[in-house]
């Protein structure tokens, strides 16, 4: 049995109280996977539990897959996580670079400066949603990999969009399949609608939705009021 659960966002950490180059790995990971700009969608496979099976819900801390060797009815036997991030948001790019620096402390000064430029750039033309998949087993990983590999702008443009509270949508403008940069698949949207910024500070939410394949649907919701970062609405 497959079910999809969007993991709840806990309190945002728009400000950590220190420069991004001093973030810990824990702070960096939270920005990427559980923040106003990064969410985690978990899809699990359960041992056959029959028609009376119950879909579980919980937070990222409570939804820990059980031992795959114990395939009693309802036991989670496999899972895949989709990390859905607003890559055009500065805190996400800063977290990506900070994680790389923490993982590679011997990185050259020149490379570090190049990465800092990427992290601190201001995005004005596009909204970019990056999706990274992480699977427990090869079967689920293979299905996701194939879906990303074969997807095209043409196959996605009618079923992939960003939506705000009033129902207005931005349609997909470009799609880049995953490459060796570690950032995942990239879904590119225009930043304006009718020559006006798509989002303004305030309430409401931004919803990302994508039918990647017949069996894979991606969805994430971002609370606009939590997206303020260093005095700017970052998305």
State where each predicted segment sits.
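PEST-like low-complexity, intrinsically disordered acidic/proline/serine-rich tracts
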Residues: 13-235
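Bacterial N-terminal signal peptides
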Residues: 1-10
């Amino acid at each position: 049995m497959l079910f999809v659960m969007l993991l709840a966002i806990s309190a945002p950490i728009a400000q950590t109280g220190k420069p991004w180059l001093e973030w810990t790995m824990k702070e960096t990971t939270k920005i990427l996977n559980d923040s106003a700009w990064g969410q985690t969608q978990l899809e699990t496979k359960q041992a056959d539990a029959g028609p009376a099976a119950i879909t579980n819900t919980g937070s990222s801390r409570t939804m820990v897959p059980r031992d795959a060797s114990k395939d009693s009815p309802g036991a989670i036997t496999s899972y895949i996580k989709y990390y859905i991030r607003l890559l055009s948001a500065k805190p996400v790019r800063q977290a990506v670079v900070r994680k790389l620096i923490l993982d590679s402390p011997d990185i050259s000064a020149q490379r570090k400066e190049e990465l800092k430029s990427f992290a601190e750039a201001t995005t004005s033309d596009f909204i970019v949603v990056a999706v990274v998949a992480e699977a427990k087993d090869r079967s689920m990983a293979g299905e996701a990999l194939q879906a990303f590999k074969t997807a095209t702008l043409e196959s996605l443009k009618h079923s992939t969009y960003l939506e705000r509270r009033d129902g207005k949508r931005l349609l997909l403008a470009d799609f880049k399949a995953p490459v060796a940069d570690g950032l995942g698949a990239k879904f590119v949207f225009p930043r304006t609608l009718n020559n006006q910024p798509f989002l303004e500070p305030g309430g409401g939410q931004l919803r990302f939705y994508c039918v990647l394949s017949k069996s894979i649907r991606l969805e994430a919701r971002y609370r606009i009021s939590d997206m303020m970062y260093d005095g700017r609405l970052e998305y």
